């Protein structure tokens, strides 16, 4: 939103300097992006009247002029402008003047003729282009000798504000003036809206066919206008200083009313319309050539203003070329409407162009402003272009409901931290146009039609705070006794998990929670993932239920960059559906290991990491927790190299090698190893208990069992551990044999058993019965002792 300070002062009786106003607006939430004067710095330029013009004796394109600059003597100036003539008044820079760019004026000779100054164009003064080739011609009543900066108000400050989407009420000079009045307490002078008398004549019927999209539509016919009339200089200046180019008088009047009071308008050529006006949704196959010379195919989600023949304009966005006014226009139809922001929002992106009107409509326009806008525009048309106005014709659809919001003074003090007197609060609310009514707890306000953003108590507190001035709220540094929170012994710190993974050579990664739907099918067999209603892209259409897909993608990126040994982990949330259909999210830790077990080095052979390498990492991560690894058929993993991680009878995760069928699909030279565990289970741990070191030597017994291939090592270890007593300190596999001497389908598994007594030296009498018990348990499970 751009406006000039001089225009603002016609509605807000403020004497603040431009610098102070800039600070005030910014601190109140209306950020001033730029504040600059209407013209660049220059000095020594006055209004001069050309008294005579003679051809230069020695140059065809130069003229010798004598001008009156108000000093009582005529000044001779040589001028080359093609439009110079006697009787005109123009800007004149005298010797000693300094023009933009530090261009200094001094007496000089031009082809032998003395020139004591320079007659100026708009370009030479740094002013907006007036479309004239030559001197900037001033009005006939311009006072000779007056400083041009003073006459044209070139020291006027132009403010450019960054208006947030919720403050559409500030997209007009009236809205800014109302805001300044509330902030400073100065008088707010609303633009005078005169009810213009109707002189009979024609009317244009209006029908709203989409009442939910258009709450109000008003039209008025004005006949016999002079569309060739010149836009007054005062109006043209205000438009230009608001960043809008003057086009033609009828278009300029519509733009002026929009800037002045905030209501976008449109002007139709009445003679180009057929029948009544309809506000409806576009029909399939309809097209419209717009004022920007673009022809668009209209979608059925688009609101249009149409006549009996077809669409005339994109409602709230841009008019159509077929019904546009021109210099030949004699009869016009003024339009002012209220369109629901929802129907206008997004149309600028949809059709590839926007307008000042759409910028306002999609944020919300005052739904009680339309009649005032028609009256104001009618007044200006009759004043500048003449004509006879007909009656206003109004159609009404669905308008927003009037909202009432309560404000508790106690809550206001709690939130802002300052006790603002009730009388001051009431004054602020009144200046904001919120019509406060006193209640037992504070006030009840009625949100005005121009404030769509006043909906709840917090909105009112924000308004009070910014008008009162956040910088006026005293600093009150929070103080209090801080209690050190206890960390339970059964819960390990989160940072310990990160440190553990980093210490084992894993690098932390972060991936999107939005993933490719195919990943969910491949890595989790999830045919019904949680789908996003508005995905960022097609490849990010669902929420992940596993971390494996993201880790595999990161592996691919590293392989593309010639990294042949990759170890990464991620701690993040996964998403699913509970038994009751509600969404659930759990935090998990996932890891991936690809490539060699150890970095390449001279002291040992290089081998690829296998299932047992990553299983060791998982065991180390869960070292304070009793876990078992149970063979599983997880969809992402190799059927023979995968296990569920079980704790207290509950599956808390899985570990294994990626299934071979995914290697070719995801362009992986070899299978990576992966794991995924519930983070809650990782953070839970048993208490660390002190245990004395035994003074007595341990005893080792090695047992080799012949068992079926279908029987896993874990099955054997579970049986042996179940038969052990407190003397058994460790049972583990140290060798597996297949081949000669064993029946087909059988294998030999060698197990070491470490026994130790904390109080006595173990004897054969104590050891042998226990070993026999272990052998018996294994035999009962289908594993016989190898002889």
Curated annotation (Swiss-Prot):
GO terms under cellular component: phenylalanine-tRNA ligase complex
Domain of life per record: Bacteria
Entry GO MF terms: ATP binding; magnesium ion binding; phenylalanine-tRNA ligase activity; tRNA binding
Domain FDX-ACB: start-end pairs: 694-786
Predominant location category: cytoplasm
Subcellular location, record wording: Cytoplasm
E.C. code: 6.1.1.20
Residue span(s) of domain tRNA-binding: 39-149
Pfam families, A to Z: B3_4, B5, FDX-ACB, tRNA_bind, tRNA_synthFbeta
Positions with a binding annotation for Mg(2+): 453, 459, 462-463
Cofactor dependence: Mg(2+)
Catalyses which reaction(s): tRNA(Phe) + L-phenylalanine + ATP = L-phenylalanyl-tRNA(Phe) + AMP + diphosphate + H(+)
Keywords assigned by UniProt, alphabetized: Aminoacyl-tRNA synthetase, ATP-binding, Cytoplasm, Ligase, Magnesium, Metal-binding, Nucleotide-binding, Protein biosynthesis, RNA-binding, tRNA-binding
GO biological-process terms attached to the record: phenylalanyl-tRNA aminoacylation
InterPro entries associated with the record: aa-tRNA-synth_II/BPL/LPL (IPR045864), B3/B4_tRNA-bd (IPR005146), DNA-bd_dom_put_sf (IPR009061), Fdx_antiC-bd (IPR005121), Fdx_antiC-bd_sf (IPR036690), NA-bd_OB-fold (IPR012340), Phe-tRNA-ligase_IIc_bsu (IPR045060), Phe-tRNA-ligase_IIc_bsu_bact (IPR004532)
PANTHER family on file: PHENYLALANINE--TRNA LIGASE BETA SUBUNIT, PHENYLALANYL-TRNA SYNTHETASE BETA CHAIN AND LEUCINE-RICH REPEAT-CONTAINING PROTEIN 47
Family recorded in the similarity comment: Belongs to the phenylalanyl-tRNA synthetase beta subunit family. Type 1 subfamily.
Subunit (UniProt): Tetramer of two alpha and two beta subunits.
Name recorded for this polypeptide: Phenylalanine--tRNA ligase beta subunit
Gene field: pheT
